[in-house]
Swiss-Prot record:
Similarity comment: Belongs to the guanylin family.
Organism expressing this protein natively: Mus musculus
Signal peptide per UniProt: 1-23
Tissue expr: Localized in both crypts and villi in the small intestine and to superficial epithelial cells in the colon.
GO function terms (MF aspect): guanylate cyclase activator activity
Propeptide residues per the UniProt entry: 24-101
Any one cellular-component term (Gene Ontology): extracellular region
Disulfide bonds: C69-C83, C105-C113, C108-C116
Subcellular location(s) per record: Secreted
Residue spans crossing the bilayer: none
Protein name: Guanylin
Record carries keyword Aminoacyl-tRNA synthetase: no
Length: 116
């Protein structure tokens, strides 16, 4: 009887983890991985400038936080609390790194990802 109850509890726990999905945590903030993935499409990719016929010079990247927080209505609601933080730029850069390769987060290669 106890084994049956334990089995049911384990299955319910596993189901709860699967339903909740992967969570990305940065400090005291946590976000669903699906919201973090949306960052990838929000930021326009800067095209490199042609310096000579063989070399490209990268442009200086514009700060991410002011652009996303003030003018981008497509910023997922779950990520909006980042805009209120004084280090929003650093947080968004870390989240963008995860957004560039979310598969790595889905297998929990990042320490910031939980719920695998």
């Amino acid at each position: 009887m106890n084994a049956c109850v334990l089995s049911v509890l384990c299955l319910l726990g596993a189901l709860a983890v699967l339903v909740e999905g992967v969570t990305v945590q940065d400090g005291d903030l946590s976000f669903p991985l699906e919201s973090v993935k949306k960052l990838k499409g929000l930021r326009e990719v800067q095209e490199p400038r042609l310096v000579s016929h063989k070399k490209f010079a990268p442009r200086l990247l514009q700060p991410v936080a002011p652009q996303l927080c003030s003018s981008h209505s497509a910023l997922p609601e779950a990520l909006r609390p980042v805009c209120e933080k004084p280090n929003a730029e650093e947080i968004l850069q870390r989240l963008e790194a995860i957004a560039q390769d979310p598969n790595t987060c889905e297998i929990c290669a990042y320490a910031a990802c939980t719920g695998c």
